[in-house]
């Protein structure tokens, strides 16, 4: 192998949705991008999550110079509570919100005290030295705030890893993709682009997140009873839209699901989730509101059996049950392989 060659090893995220994990290796230095999980296929009963196979890394932990996280979705951070013990003492680098979401997961796993979490601000244009690699985070638009990609200067040239992104001219948080940084990379010359390509085969452009807010407004205006919105626990922008819509329609909002409740708490503490009308309430207090004055945001948009929506559909949630006149919004497209699980939950709601 040439002396300036860089090896890229994908431990997940290729020809599949989820389990994103990429290694870049040169000599005695390895950097890791993301550490996610995938959801099991329909023919994998009894399995809750699928993790990347990190056997290659376990044999080379002394070479790991850092784990760099693009954003806080499960398919990019969900593997950390399970795999980080085998990767220590490697530091984990993330933006502010992503670091906060990782902290919640590691605290639950009793790993936070052992972890070396390091925060960066992409707007400050940092350059992080990691062995022979120089990592430059840049902001991208996604359905969660504080998402980034990485420009990685390597002995073989500049490699750009986009992470998940969209070119959204009207993002919920008002923060655009850093086009100036992308233009700078173009001028410097990019040796390799490692790009998100989900739905790349679909014609046209991905709509702005604001389109979802318009749909929420219509559904909330028509709803006569309670409104249930199922989403991902880490989809902070979607939770913000539910809060804003509920406030406009005179409804309180109760988060359902431990992971969602924790993420809402940390996002509020860090200023990434706002509730100026004080519509957020605890699930145990939601019963005191009339049906037309309460909305729930919950986990379970992918039909996960232990998530809040599944427990509501099965009639075994301790705080709430769905009934006639209620409206349920499943605010996510089923991940490939999850369609049957999602439709099974929907059927049980009727």
Report residues per predicted region.
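His/Asp/Glu-rich metal-coordinating catalytic cores
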Residues: 1-68, 73-289, 304-321, 337-344
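Conserved acidic residues
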Residues: 65, 191, 294, 326-329
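Gly/His-enriched, cation/cofactor- and phosphate-binding structural elements
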Residues: 253, 330-331
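Conserved two-lobed SF2 helicase motor
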Residues: 293-302
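Aromatic- and Gly/Pro-rich donor/ligand-binding loops
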Residues: 300-301, 332-336
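His/Asp/Glu-enriched, well-ordered alpha-helical/loop segment
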Residues: 344-350
């Amino acid at each position: 192998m040439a002396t300036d060659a860089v090896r890229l090893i994908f431990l997940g995220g290729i020809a599949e949705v989820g389990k994103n994990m990429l290694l870049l290796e040169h000599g005695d230095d390895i950097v890791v991008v993301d550490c996610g999980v995938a959801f099991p296929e329909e023919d994998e009963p009894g399995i809750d999550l699928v993790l990347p196979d990190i056997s290659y890394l376990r044999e080379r932990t002394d070479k790991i110079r850092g784990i760099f996280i693009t954003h806080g979705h499960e398919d990019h951070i969900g593997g950390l509570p399970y795999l980080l013990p085998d990767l220590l003492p490697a530091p984990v680098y993330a933006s502010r919100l992503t670091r906060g979401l990782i902290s919640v997961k590691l605290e639950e796993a009793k790993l936070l005290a052992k972890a070396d979490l390091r925060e960066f601000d992409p707007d400050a244009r940092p350059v992080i030295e990691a062995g022979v690699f120089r990592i430059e985070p840049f902001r991208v638009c996604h359905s969660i705030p504080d998402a980034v990609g990485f420009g990685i200067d390597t002995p073989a040239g500049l490699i750009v890893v986009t992470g998940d992104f969209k070119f959204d001219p009207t993002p919920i948080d008002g923060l655009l993709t850093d086009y100036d940084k992308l233009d700078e990379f173009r001028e410097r010359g990019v040796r390799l682009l490692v790009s998100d390509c989900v739905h790349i085969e679909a014609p046209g452009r991905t709509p702005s997140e604001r389109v979802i807010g318009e749909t929420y407004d219509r559904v909330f205006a028509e709803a006569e009873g309670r409104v249930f919105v199922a989403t991902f626990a880490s989809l902070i922008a979607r939770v913000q839209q539910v809060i804003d819509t509920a406030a406009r329609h005179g409804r309180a909002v109760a988060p359902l699901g431990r992971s969602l409740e924790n993420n809402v708490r940390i996002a509020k503490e860090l200023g990434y989730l706002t509730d100026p009308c004080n519509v957020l309430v605890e699930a145990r207090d939601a019963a005191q509101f009339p049906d037309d004055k309460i909305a729930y945001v919950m986990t379970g948009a992918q039909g996960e059996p232990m998530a809040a929506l599944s427990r509501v559909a099965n009639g075994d949630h301790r705080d709430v049950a769905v009934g006639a006149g209620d409206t349920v919004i499943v605010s996510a497209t089923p991940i490939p392989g999850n369609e049957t699980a999602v439709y099974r939950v929907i059927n049980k709601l009727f």
